[in-house]
């Protein structure tokens, strides 16, 4: 630990005595954001800082260096996968399954866009998959078992100057989201 490092409770992990990151990572490829990327968390004027937290930028939204690196890396990786990112209105929507199997994203993408990759899955197979999932039963997509209980996440981001706003964040079982 360096002299200027601040220790605190991380808002992401809930862990105490963590080194609080001073700056948050740049998030890239949010549609409509600055070409060099934008920040999810930032305070660029002293008037935006909380009273008593003016010793370091990171103290206004205390996130550990580890958690900031982790969320920045994961979010940039998800946004880099154009196949599973959609724009609705002014909101960039990114979605993923907890076990990181893209088959869940592929099925959800059909619901969002109404388009499916030609030849990948027939209409009949898709109907069977969706019927099983809606009944709470596992389904199979190209030898990947689709579990309706799999945790699934949907994040909506909107650009605002050099910052990003979280429009919504949903977490539920895949079957319930469908």
Language-model regions, residue ranges each:
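Extended alpha-helical scaffolding segments
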Residues: 1, 17-178
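Flanking scaffold residues of small Cys/His-coordinated metal-binding clusters
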Residues: 4-5
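The −1 position to Zn-ligating cysteines in a subset of zinc-ribbon hairpins
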Residues: 9
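Short Cys/His-rich metal-coordination motifs, predominantly Zn2+-binding knuckles/fingers
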Residues: 13
């Amino acid at each position: 630990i360096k002299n200027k490092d601040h220790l605190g409770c991380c808002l992401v992990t809930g862990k105490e005595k963590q080194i609080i990151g001073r700056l948050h990572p740049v998030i890239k490829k949010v549609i409509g954001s600055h070409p060099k990327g934008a920040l999810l968390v930032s305070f660029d004027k002293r008037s935006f800082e909380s009273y008593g937290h003016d010793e370091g930028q990171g103290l206004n939204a205390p996130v550990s260096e580890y958690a900031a690196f982790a969320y920045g890396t994961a979010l940039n990786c998800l946004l880099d996968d154009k196949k599973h990112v959609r724009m609705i209105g002014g909101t960039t929507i990114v979605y993923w399954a907890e076990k990181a199997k893209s088959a869940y994203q592929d099925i959800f993408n059909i619901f969002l866009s109404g388009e499916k990759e030609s030849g990948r899955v027939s209409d009949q197979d898709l109907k069977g998959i969706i019927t099983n999932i809606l009944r709470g039963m596992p389904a199979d997509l190209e030898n990947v078992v689709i579990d309706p209980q799999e945790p699934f996440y949907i994040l909506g981001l909107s650009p605002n100057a050099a910052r990003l706003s979280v429009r919504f964040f949903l977490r539920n079982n895949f079957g319930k989201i469908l």
